[in-house]
Curated annotation (Swiss-Prot):
Its EC number is 5.2.1.8. Belongs to the FKBP-type PPIase family. Tig subfamily. Consists of 3 domains; the N-terminus binds the ribosome, the middle domain has PPIase activity, while the C-terminus has intrinsic chaperone activity on its own. Residues 435-465 have a biased composition (Polar residues). This is Trigger factor. Residues 160-235 form the PPIase FKBP-type domain. Residues 412-465 are annotated as: Disordered. Keywords: Cell cycle, Cell division, Chaperone, Cytoplasm, Isomerase, RNA-binding, Rotamase, rRNA-binding. It comes from Deinococcus radiodurans (strain ATCC 13939 / DSM 20539 / JCM 16871 / CCUG 27074 / LMG 4051 / NBRC 15346 / NCIMB 9279 / VKM B-1422 / R1).
Amino acid sequence: MAELISKEGNKVEFKVSVPAAEVNRAYDQVWAGLARDVRVPGFRPGKAPRKVIENRVGKGYVESQVRDRLLETHYSQGLRELGLNLVDATVDPQDVQSGQAFEFTVKGETYPEVKLGDWQGLKVSAQAPEITDEVLEQTLSDLRERNASFEKAERPIEAADQVTIQELGEGDSEEGGSYPIYLDMAEEHVRNALLGKSAGDVVDITVPAHQHGDHEHAEHTVRVKVVEVSSKKLQDLNDEFATSLNYESMDKLRTDLREELERRAQQEGDNLRREELVGHLVEGMTVEIPQALIDRRREGMMSEIQDDLRRQGVQWKEYEAFMQEQGKLDEFEADLTKNAETRVRRDLALEQLATDLNAQVNEAEFNQTLMNLAQANGMNVQQLVQQLGQDGVQSYYISLLRERGLQRALAQLSGEGQSTEAASPKATGTEAAGTEQSEPAQTETAQNDAGQTETAQSEGEQQSE
């Protein structure tokens, strides 16, 4: 149970009381976890008495685990009960003891006051792209291209051929690897150098000065040998082609493909309308944003960047030093701050919209979305809450409110009422888990074929740099 102690301007203090029964339940959960994880000589796993385990890990450790578990659950719950959303907070917990209620106080700063401009008369003009017969035929043509086969050709290279080349070293030794290049997708300098050549020819490809990633490349020459020339063979658009993509017939392929294109077009239209409304809200709102809010968002974005680099085997200090050498560090930091402020403005506008429209997500809905999110990430709810932390759980709850408010506003502008709101939390939970709705398996197969072709082409061009 949360109780507001004081609220002056955007400064707030409140107290949360946790009943003794829930404290005991948290103790039981912690003891169960310790009994499972702590190995005590002379006892089978899970059979050691609590006193023995306590002597092994320390009473203070047990209490800290219980306290953290209670804070993880009841801090965010207290914020929801009081309708608070804090920029920053200091939590002061009392000692925790089995069989006794637990209390903690929170002092923090609420989000700034936001006033939205008039949006209810907005005419959202963004429309879903029209799926015409021409669009369908072009998509079928693309599928045909992606599923093309290649046959060895004993003739000079033509514009649509696949050409296997071998990079040569000094003295024309076969120093580099061999790889295919799809001429109709190749860079102009590669295409022009190879057209008209035949298998066995040695070709000098002049690569113009360019930037690849973070590296500047001066103009240079790559010497290659044409290993093999293959001509493209396109299948006819008939039932046999449809069957190769796991469709019953060409008619079925056309029908399903049109439905998929229309679904994607509708999704694109929805996204365009959302962005149009959000842009209008941000442009018309009045707000003074605390620098701490921008700084916190910037820190979060920086952490994401560092995590991405780490996954690629690059340390942030190395990347920072490289940008410094290139004279790009100041620009990077300025862009990061600007993007952080843009995201904060967007979130504040959507949160105020949800407040103005009295959009709500009840406890049952929120718990269900947490369960969906946990399952999507292969964990239980408690593990998810521990991973997200107090602020993460609250941020997730606020993201659901933002989504619900946006859906309600869009429905109001389109005259559709609130019919789409019920699905909001579940859909948002799935997106937050990083799992988008899957495409039909048959269409996905064709897309995978395309991806393999593009990857091979990309690899070929990169090795020619």
